[in-house]
Amino acid sequence: MGAKKNLLAELREKSSEELDEFIRDNKKALFTLRAEAALQNKAVKTHQFSLYKKSIARALTIKQEKKDRVHG
């Protein structure tokens, strides 16, 4: 639970551009993981799919919160 709180605090400190970069990097890693799972016959740690997706969702949520704070 502590790691999640640290990630959230870290994401809240980032600028919009840094959040975009974080999202892009996580999407790229998720794509690579999916390709690795589909194209290779080696075992893939399937829990990483949900970790990447949740990290992306958290970053998008924080980005939306910042946008709402500015406009609302």
From Swiss-Prot:
Disulfide bonds: none annotated. One of its GO terms (cellular component) is cytosolic large ribosomal subunit. It holds the Pfam family Ribosomal_L29. PROSITE patterns: RIBOSOMAL_L29. Keywords: Ribonucleoprotein, Ribosomal protein. One of its GO terms (biological process) is translation. CDD domains: Ribosomal_L29_HIP. GO terms for molecular function: structural constituent of ribosome. It comes from the Bacteria. PANTHER family: 60S RIBOSOMAL PROTEIN L35/50S RIBOSOMAL PROTEIN L29 (PTHR10916), LARGE RIBOSOMAL SUBUNIT PROTEIN UL29C (PTHR10916:SF0). Belongs to the universal ribosomal protein uL29 family. This is Large ribosomal subunit protein uL29.
